[in-house]
Amino acid sequence: MVGSSNSLAGLQDHLKLAREYALEGSYDTSVIFFDGAIAQINKHLNTLDDPLARTKWMNVKKAIMEETEVVKQLDAERRAFKEAPTGRRAASPPINTKSSFVFQPLDEYPTSSGGGPMDDPDVWRPPTRDVTSRRPARAGQTGTRKSPQDGAWARGPTTRTGPASRGGRGGATSKSTAGARSSTAGKKGAASKSNKAESMNGDAEDGKSKRGLYEGPDEDLAAMLERDVLDSTPGVRWDDVAGLSEAKRLLEEAVVLPLWMPEYFQGIRRPWKGVLMFGPPGTGKTLLAKAVATECGTTFFNVSSATLASKWRGESERMVRCLFDLARAYAPSTIFIDEIDSLCNSRGGSGEHESSRRVKSELLVQVDGVSNTATNEDGSRKIVMVLAATNFPWDIDEALRRRLEKRIYIPLPDFESRKALININLRTVEVASDVNIEDVARRTEGYSGDDLTNVCRDASMNGMRRKIAGKTRDEIKNMSKDDISNDPVAMCDFEEAIRKVQPSVSSSDIEKHEKWLSEFGSA
């Protein structure tokens, strides 16, 4: 469900903008947003297994495509009015909008190779890049060159594929390739429009947009990764992470200092290729990764195993390669792979699938190939840091363990860290004078950071629970904000919360992590 919500994020806004631009007469911009919405629906359809839901979304897609065709026809009429009357061809034949294909210029028609087998007449060869050669048209299609008076839908790119075998398979290939090409064209146009929108909204910290820096064969995958995993402003600072001073120092040395002192980190002092953070759940590993990206000002890629999963053969490996290419384009950048044990566990197991093994191999190649010595055009270094987090470090493949050169243990918070975390959690609420933070910290020994946060949240809500106890629904609705928020958090609230919230980490889990640290730790 998380992947479905991500694939539909912003769909309503895209459709709203598309219709607003169409009403204003900006048909080109409207078509771009319509194409983006159709691409999102196509991605969502790939995640659906329910036939009823797929049928509903197919009807939605069909309605949007019909609306897009209307906008394209309006744009064609507008362009026709702008053209000079003398520029129209004499006796131009009417354009059949119901045709299964749109005519191409004469120099883009394919021909059969001499001596070779006859090509399928329903499947066209890819166009040649040699614009100087003139090739004869297909029989019966002479004189169908497009004029400037034709609409944009008639002058747009046609759906062509390479040679395929006769039968239904060739038609399916033609449709899938056409959808990919139209989606690519829509994303290219949307990228130029999004630069202006981002600068107005102020999403980028420095006011500059780096979209369009990726140059590679997988622009569709790059656009998908930009939308799903790119987070340029995580917004977490060192002060938001309580304790963990040793982990902060190591991460600062591995990630932040090479950006501040690039001339020092040369040769044997080169930055680390990868850092693995392991420890019990809820100790702040993900929060530390976001703080690293914020403090050193790098672009943050938050990756999970679901992001790199695909049902198509070879697609997951391409996504891994495209992710690292995109990270180099956005350098300096940080690739954070959460729960890496689910993506790259030990190879050679009896239940391991072939596709999973290929993804692991590609990830190992890319992590090993991360070069921190390349530079941009302005001379700045292209630093790509791989950060990984796991609760099961003993399940990680040993080859990946070698590539993650720094392996940092993130333990449960100690007494001072628990005090700092309680103060951080309570900084937005009013605290009564009888609250003893040190006593609460002593009584929560063995609690993880998430457990402490749950204790503070539960304690801060006890005042509201006392206020609404015994009241009807209408009485609760009529209560003012001051009536609810006036009660400060008291010590009795913490005592009740500690009784209800138990620690989620067992001592046996801590022993296993400490044993692995003594064997493979590299702090």
Swiss-Prot record:
Catalysis performed (reactions): n ATP + n H2O + a microtubule = n ADP + n phosphate + (n+1) alpha/beta tubulin heterodimers
Location(s), subcellular: Cytoplasm, Cytoskeleton
Residue numbers binding ATP: G279, P280, P281, G282, T283, G284, K285, T286
Alphabetized UniProt keyword annotations: ATP-binding, Cytoplasm, Cytoskeleton, Isomerase, Microtubule, Nucleotide-binding
Record note on disruption phenotype: Severe dwarf phenotype, with small and round dark-green rosette leaves as well as wide and short petioles. The ipga1-2 ktn1-4 and an-t1 ktn1-4 double mutants have an enhanced phenotype of pavement cells, resembling soap bubbles and no lobe formation.
Region (Disordered): 82-215
Principal location: cytoplasm
CDD domains: Kp60-NTD
GO molecular function, one term: microtubule severing ATPase activity
Compositional bias of kind Low complexity: 178-194
Tissue-specific expression: Expressed ubiquitously, including siliques, flowers, leaves, stems and roots.
The EC number(s) this enzyme carries: 5.6.1.1
Function description: Severs microtubules in vitro in an ATP-dependent manner. Required for oligomerization of functional KTN80-KTN1 complexes that catalyze microtubule severing. This activity may promote rapid reorganization of cellular microtubule arrays. May be required for reorientation of cortical microtubule arrays during cellular elongation. Failure to correctly orient these arrays drastically compromises fiber length, cell wall thickness and mechanical strength. May also be required for the spatial organization of developmental cues within the root.
Complex and partners: May homooligomerize. Component of KTN80-KTN1 complexes composed of a hexamer of KTN1-KTN80 heterodimers that sense microtubule (MT) geometry to confer precise MT severing. Interacts directly with KTN80.1, KTN80.2, KTN80.3 and KTN80.4. Can interact with KTN80.1. May interact with the kinesin related protein KIN14A. Interacts with microtubule polymers. Binds to IPGA1.
Family under the similarity heading: Belongs to the AAA ATPase family. Katanin p60 subunit A1 subfamily.
Protein name in UniProt: Katanin p60 ATPase-containing subunit A1
